[in-house]
Amino acid sequence: TKKDVLPGEIFWSDEAELEIPKNHYLCFEITFSGSEIPFTPDKIVPAFSLDENGFKEDKEFPQPIFVGIRVSKSKKVVFIGDSITQGLGTTPDKYEFWAARLAERLGKNFSFWNLGLGCGHAYDAVTDGSWLKKAKTGDTVFVCFGVNDINMHRSVTGICNDTERIVYLLKSAGCKVILLSVPPFDMVGEDKKKWYAVNDFLRNTVSKNADGFFDVSDIIGKPSPRRHMSLYGPHPDG
């Protein structure tokens, strides 16, 4: 099968019926041609590229972002945010991916799509491009941005406006939105001040437009007045 893909286009393969024995792997081969093809290396699925010397382990090419199965009457839950949302560094040198753990606990009545992306920013998602369009396919969307926006020295107003707009775009698409506070990240100086200012706005203003609000620091932050610091180190997934 061959398909020409336009810039920014999202495409899906045709449905196929497969029977995979327990403890076996599904392998498939895809050929891309063109120039400046975007990709993200943040995946743990084994991936290989083929050249004149044979197959070699390689993540620097486009890979399927979603492999789904049809489940009747399941609620679709989406997580969008950065690497904290994605579930990297859950404990030292360990990637546990919260969406996968929740899927195991909640069973077949729920399906999860982990759209957390390393170094993700609110200003990326607010462009309403392919990333946010994927999130709009969910019934419930958890939104957690801010750490990378602050680390990139963006203004408090810019971060707050972008987050508020993201909530609006998702709600307009018919999604229920659960807004998360900016997680603790051991920030200092001006970044620390921005962390408190952004979280105050999210808690007191943006949360009123969402269907729920979860303050991450209640679970993984240190006691006040050090709520901006994580109990589990600088990448606070623990």
Enumerate the language-model features and the residues they cover.
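Proline-centered loop/turn at the N-terminus of a beta-strand
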Residues: 111, 176-178, 212
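A cross-domain feature marking catalytic cores of carbohydrate-active enzymes
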Residues: 30, 145, 181-182
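Class I S-adenosyl-L-methionine
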Residues: 103, 171, 203-207
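Residue-level recognition of beta-strand->loop/alpha-helix junctions
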Residues: 114-116, 181, 215
